[in-house]
Swiss-Prot record:
This is Carbamoyl phosphate synthase large chain. ATP 1 binds at R129, R169, G175, G176, K208, I210, E215, G241, I242, H243, Q284, E298. Mn(2+) 1 binds at Q284, E298. GO terms for biological process: 'de novo' UMP biosynthetic process; glutamine metabolic process; L-arginine biosynthetic process.
């Protein structure tokens, strides 16, 4: 069926900020879909709230709205634009839920907007747990014994019938939000109310646990002709019970018999047909390992995390084709963009193994609950491709950037066998590595299977790796064995360790005996059709399919998996750098390993290598491609950390030199530079050990800010108030990196300012200066940023421009530089300088209209700012205000403290833009998920040093009609100054404690500032966690709470007597 001619404009809803469970895969899907629809001649209107996305670039859609994803704002846009149709299946759960809400609000009927692709009835049937269960019963497809509950009492009644354990799955949520496995009554009482709270329809499915079954996924496509195909089948190495986003996944499935595969394939196609889904869909099935018995777990009637993985694993662009199906085209008339000769109705075939491993945030949150269950905890993922499962698995492991390079932990020998077994039984994020350690201690695969229910096939493959390790140890220098272990994915680093040699010695030995990787093409068809996809992976075989062209080449290093501190912003910068390189006529080559991102879409660059970002893997590609140079500025700390290794191997780093990077990071060199430039910085010193740290801190004077050098996202950064805390910190930090000292700075209380600038080696241009709402001490990535700054004087702005130009010139920057300043007592100090892309690049690009990364890349390649039209020091400011608001995923991470400080904790960001600060903040806070009400109840629980500032804040809330609740000490202080409050009792020794108030829904906002002391049992910690778990807004910075108050004041009218 040809595409529809009766519709001209299509509204596409994006997925909003990155949170755990919904990451960059939707930027990739949305970008593909928008371009695909425009290719067919439709006008595309895009709405998303996340500035750090390629899909919100003006080039991707005809009209782009960066506005909050709420019914209120979407209704305004629909009334203004009057689109013919809405496409909701490419923006994850957020877009699906919004489509349902928009339909129910009546706006779609009012404006005559049709929902494209999968119909609303099908979405509801797949998402509503009750309707889905009824459909499966109708189709005679088995689902676990289950009940739909709307109250805790209903849940208790169901458990009496079937007994524990039960799995709780809230309706219309993603990433397992609010769900979990209940083993007893205590779990049930915690998880069910939580799940009901997070479900927008206040509904949970309780089902008999089938944990331990194999979890198999089928990624399927269907068109309006009822043609349906399987794009990819995937197998979770971790069995049912661990969320698929937290599982290690392989494609194609490895342990299914032909009969099992065809049985589950047929079931998946039957379900997608019954649901009448038009587009992509993910079917999750639980298979009994000992029989042909299976259960349907769930269906996602949309593009998902799994579809991004399936697209990258097979090369089949699911989102692009789903968009064409949505406008009426059929699979047999859509050309496969990879082969350019076959049609999209041909099922992809793959002749390699793909492994996906999730990336967890527990290097940031050491105190977090690492147990994995049905609620997702990973922030990102890596993917690797190999010809054997062992090769694919080991390549994925070394892509993770945990400091782990193999199947085991760096300090594995320090663990007792008892501890290892305990960690295997507890399904945590490090279980894979503990399995490696157990195999090294000769624990049998049968015993490990008993603890984990991981299939013996996978455990056997892991045992192969350990057996080869032992062989290496016993056969030092054996060249044939060297050749063999390379085909199984062993890195030179691991071989060097086993042979007691250095990594360069192993590399040299390999090259001498011509043991080099070849590069194979990912072509969707296992070489059945001619294909010229520029998408490659390495393996140790014979025929190389990546031929070097004669064109001058530039290699861009990507930023690897998404994690806290290094998010999608760096992928955004990478994609813009690639576009600039292509525009200037060079061949753009990307090396990256993140399956969720736009940079790993093979149609973006001239060549894509899907490889680990390690010295060995990158150098082999560079040896083959022989580029003019490598760009490390846009790949975050991942790429920066490779710079010195590449330079030692004779590779040219383009843009700011290694020396510039080192000067900015090395305390002594940087201090000398600042003295020479006459730019002040807070008093600071360095230390390698506890003794020196204590001496230096006492000379500087507490409080001090301590951090390791060469880190991103404020990792391991703290404000320390005394010797005892500093001693604890040093013991932990020295463990973080023994090669670089700990930096100790005087902590200045003041206004934090952030500046991004572009330099061409001679001149410097500043796209924008941003002011943070939270004072210095809160990590810049967790602060609300305002552009343009609202409280800086003309003189301060002139000083900031002057310092920025001097620093760019002094560091000989070519490309981007990010500088953080603090304004304290009238003086401007430099806090930190990074000669690379920062996480504010997308935000500034969107609000100023300056394509920051693109211009920077052109400067790196020799263009001059004045020739590109940038002749001023700073960009002109428009007549609007924009705010960047951080978004957190605390509800998914148990036991993580929500207090904001110098270590970054946010996973994503949104933007709010309007004519004044209050309106911009309203939009930004709303987009971040904060429901702003003009009345309610605020709970204050404040430490002594903040009580005075909190009093003014409480008075402000009281003036606009909020009731003030307090804990005892705070209440007494507020009452002394005439403020009327209601006091709630202390934790554990009161009939109505502060925790009861939160749990009973008697509090709308919590404002809590911390008392010093790190124990998780501290009252403040328990208050903050309770607020997070019950979905109550919790502010730990008075500055952020004050910003909310300003918004509420602008919405309200004060009432007062004469």
């Amino acid at each position: 069926m040809p595409k529809r001619k009766d519709i001209k404009t299509i509204l596409v809803i994006g997925s909003g900020p990155i949170i755990i469970g919904q990451a960059a895969e939707f930027d990739y899907a949305g970008t593909q879909a928008c371009l695909s629809l425009r290719e067919e001649g439709y006008e595309v209107i895009l709405v998303n709230s996340n500035p750090a996305t390629i899909m919100t670039d003006k080039e991707i859609a005809d009209k782009v709205y960066i506005e909050p994803l709420t019914v209120e704002f979407l209704s305004k846009i629909i009334r203004k634009e009057k689109p013919d149709a809405l496409l909701p299946t490419l923006g994850g759960q957020v877009a699906l839920n919004l489509a349902v809400s928009l339909h129910e609000s009546g706006i779609l009927d009012e404006c005559g907007v049709e929902i494209l692709g999968t119909k609303l009835t099908s979405i509801k049937q797949a998402e509503d747990r009750e309707l889905f269960r009824d459909l499966m019963n109708e189709l005679n497809e088995p689902v676990p014994d289950s009940a739909i509950v709307h109250t805790l009492e209903e849940a208790e009644n169901f458990v009496k019938e079937i007994d524990y354990p039960v799995i709780v799955r809230p309706a219309f949520t993603m990433g397992g939000t609010g769900g979990g496995i209940c083993y007893n009554e205590e779990d049930l009482h915690e998880i069910v109310p939580n799940g009901l709270n997070y479900s927008p329809v206040h509904q949970c499915l309780l089902e008999k646990s089938i944990a331990g079954y194999k979890e198999i996924e089928y990624e399927v496509m269907r068109d309006s002709n009822d043609t349906a195909i399987v794009v990819c089948n995937m197998e979770n190495i971790d069995p049912v019970g661990i969320h698929t986003g937290d599982s290690i996944v392989v494609a194609p499935s490895q342990t299914l018999t032909d009969r099992e595969h065809h049985m589950l394939r047929d079931v998946s196609l039957k379900i997608i047909r019954a649901l009448k889904i038009e587009g992509g869909c993910n079917v999750q099935i639980a298979l009994d390992p000992n029989s042909f018995k299976y259960y349907i777990i769930e269906v996602n009637p949309r593009v998902s995390r799994s579809s991004a993985l399936a697209s990258k694993a097979t090369g089949y662009p699911i989102a692009k084709i789903a968009a064409k199906i949505a406008v009426g085209m059929t699979l047999d008339e859509i050309i496969n963009p990879v082969t350019k000769s076959s049609y999209a109705c041909f099922e992809p075939a793959i002749d390699y193994v793909v492994t996906k491993i999730p990336r967890f945030p527990f290097d940031k949150f050491g105190d977090g609950d690492r147990y994995l269950g049905t609620q997702m905890k990973a922030t990102g993922e890596v993917m690797a491709i190999g010809r054997t499962l062992e090769e694919s698995l080991l390549k994925a492991i070394r892509s993770l950037e945990y400091g782990v390079h193999h199947l085991g932990l760096p300090n594995g020998e320090e663990f007792s066998l008892e501890k290892i077994i305990k960690r295997i039984k507890l399904a945590g994020d490090e279980r894979l590595f503990f399995i490696g350690e157990a195999l090294r201690r000769d624990v049998s695969i049968e015993e490990i299977h008993e603890y984990t229910k991981i299939d013996l096939f996978f455990l056997n493959k892991m045992k192969n790796i350990i057996d080869l390790e032992h062989l290496l140890k016993d056969n030092k220098g054996n060249i044939e064995l060297l050749r063999k272990v390379k085909t199984f994915g062993f890195s030179d680093r691991v071989i060097a360790h086993r042979w007691e040699m250095t990594e360069p010695e192993i590399t040299e030995l390999r090259h001498k005996h011509n043991i080099r990787p070849v590069y194979k093409m990912v072509d969707t068809c296992a070489a059945e059709f001619d294909s010229n996809t520029p998408y490659f992976y390495s393996t140790y075989e014979f025929e190389n399919e990546s031929t070097r062209s004669d064109k001058e080449k530039i290699v861009v290093l990507g930023s690897g998996p998404i994690r806290i501190g290094q998010g999608i912003e760096f992928d955004y910068a990478t994609v813009h750098a690639i576009m600039a390189i292509k525009k200037l006529g060079y061949e753009a080559i990307v090396i990256n390993n993140n399956p969720e991102t736009v940079s790993t879409d093979f149609s973006i660059s001239d060549k894509l290598y899907f490889e680990p970002l390690t010295q060995e893997d990158v150098m082999e590609i560079l040896d083959l491609e022989k580029p003019l140079g490598v760009v490390v500025q846009f790949g975050g700390q991942t790429a920066i950390n490779l710079a010195d290794k590449l330079v030692k191997n004779g590779i040219q780093i383009l843009g700011s030199s290694l020396d510039s990077i080192d000067t900015a990071e090395d305390r002594d060199r940087f201090e000398k530079l600042l003295i020479g430039l006459k730019i002040p910085q807070p008093l600071g010193k360095t230390a390698f050990d506890v003794e020196t740290a204590l001496k230096n801190a006492n000379e500087i004077g507490y409080p001090v800010l301590v951090r390791p050098s060469y880190v991103l996202g404020g990792r391991a950064m703290e404000i320390v108030y005394n010797d005892e805390d500093l001693t604890k910190y040093m013991e932990k930090a020295v463990h973080i990196n023994p090669d670089h000292p700990v930096l100790i700075d005087r902590y200045l209380i003041g206004k934090e300012i952030e500046v991004d600038a572009i330099s061409d080696g001679e001149n410097t241009f500043i796209p924008g200066i941003m002011e943070h709402i939270e004072r210095a001490g809160v990590h810049s990535g967790d602060s609300i940023s305002i552009y343009p700054p609202q409280s800086l004087s003309e003189k301060e702005i002139e000083t900031l421009i002057d310092y920025t130009k001097k620093l760019a010139s002094g560091l000989e920057v070519k490309g981007l530089i990010n500088i953080q300043y603090v304004v304290s007592k009238g003086e401007i100090y430099v806090l930190e300088v990074n000669p690379r892309a920062s996480r504010t690049v997308p935000f500034l690009s969107k609000v100023t209209g300056v394509p920051v990364a693109n211009i920077a890349m052109q400067c790196i390649l020799g263009k001059k700012l004045k020739d590109l039209g940038f002749t001023k020091d700073i960009a002109d400011i428009g007549n609007f205000v924009s705010v960047k608001v951080p978004v957190f995923s605390f509800q998914k991470l148990k036991n993580v403290d929500t207090t904001l400080g110098p270590e970054m904790k946010s996973t994503g960001e949104v933007i709010g833009t309007d004519v004044n600060l209050q309106k911009a903040l309203y939009k930004g806070l709303t987009a971040a998920g904060i429901k702003i009400k003009d009345y309610g109840r605020v709970l204050f629980t404040i430490d002594d040093k903040n009580k005075e500032a909190a009093l003014n804040l409480a008075k402000g809330f009281s003036d606009v009609g909020f009731s003030i609740l307090t804990t005892e000490g705070t209440g007494i202080y507020f009452e002394e100054y005439g403020l009327k409050v209601k006091k709630v009792g202390k934790i554990d020794n009161s009939d109505y404690s502060v925790l009861d108030a939160i749990q009973n829904g008697d509090v709308d906002i919590v404002i809590n500032t911390t008392t010093k002391g790190k124990s998780s049992e501290k009252d403040g910690f328990r208050i903050r966690r309770k607020a997070t778990e019950y979905g109550v807004i919790c502010f730990t910075s008075l500055d952020t709470a004050n910003a909310l108050l300003r918004v509420i004041e602008s919405m309200s009218f004060r009432v007062q007597t004469l």
